Regions:
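Substrate-binding clefts and catalytic carboxylate motifs of secreted carbohydrate-active enzymes
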Residues: 45, 106-205
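Short, flexible loop segments at the rims of nucleotide/cofactor-binding pockets, characterized by
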Residues: 21-23, 100-102, 176
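Substrate-binding cleft/loops of secretory-pathway carbohydrate-active enzymes
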Residues: 53-66, 79-117, 132-136, 190-192, ...
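Active-site mouth of glycoside hydrolases
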Residues: 1-86, 117
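Generic intrinsically disordered, low-complexity segments enriched for polar/acidic and small residues
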Residues: 71, 85-86, 99, 151, ...
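Short, low-complexity, polar/charged sequence segments that are solvent-exposed and flexible
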Residues: 24-25, 63-67, 93-96, 141-146
Length: 205
């Protein structure tokens, strides 16, 4: 099954700069714990994604959450900084090296044991964040603010260079390559007895 990590809606570079915003996050944290706290898969709680700034503020939130509801594990932020209050750490990298492999180079070196051997469980962040060529047939499925303008840019570039007829081949080839990479990276983490697992980017409700 899947375990859920809930996050505060915090993805900022100046944590702690605005007291009113900090108060909002604390209220939101309590609201999340109150509303979803009994969900059996809700085992991890994090203050937000790739935050930067005053981590004392984030540690304070972690300690308050732990005191309020100790049924799950808490972490200050995904990526960027590992804090003393972290009961687990989700990141691309630890103090011992990279745990999320982004490079597409051919390789047989998938051992991430050393990199995940720190003082708390380590979960690899964004292992599925891989690029592939777009499917231009999907453009017509979206309207309004969701129209994929970036797809239109790539389609125009292909047409300008006389390669538009290859678009479907590019889509299929890069999709297969992405699938192979995703499989190898996640299997490497599953085979690593020191790994705490890997984090999927999102789970639609």
């Amino acid at each position: 099954g899947l375990y859920l990590q809930a996050e505060l809606p915090m993805w900022i570079k100046d944590v702690g700069q605005y007291p009113a915003r900090r108060d909002y996050f604390e209220k939101e944290m309590y609201a999340i714990l109150e509303e979803y706290g009994n969900h059996p898969s809700f085992i991890l709680m994090c203050n937000g994604n790739e935050n930067e700034g005053n981590f004392d503020v984030l540690e304070d939130l972690v300690k308050k959450a732990q005191k309020y509801d100790d049924r799950r594990l808490y972490s200050a932020s995904t990526a960027r900084t590992h804090t003393a209050s972290d009961q687990y750490y989700t990141s691309h990298v630890t103090s011992k090296g990279w745990i999320t492999v982004y490079e597409g180079r051919p390789s047989t070196d998938w051992d991430r044991s050393k990199e995940t051997e720190i003082d708390c469980p380590v979960i690899a962040h964004e292992t599925g964040q891989r690029c592939m060529f777009p499917n231009f047939d999907e453009i017509k499925k979206y309207t309004g603010v969701l129209v994929p303008r970036n797809f239109e840019v790539f389609r125009e570039r292909l047409a300008r260079n006389g390669m538009l007829h290859q678009a479907d081949d590019f889509f299929k080839a890069t999709g297969m390559h992405t699938e192979l990479q995703y499989k190898e990276v996640n299997e490497a983490l599953l085979l690593n007895r020191k790994s705490g697992g890997f984090l999927l980017l999102g789970l639609p409700a």
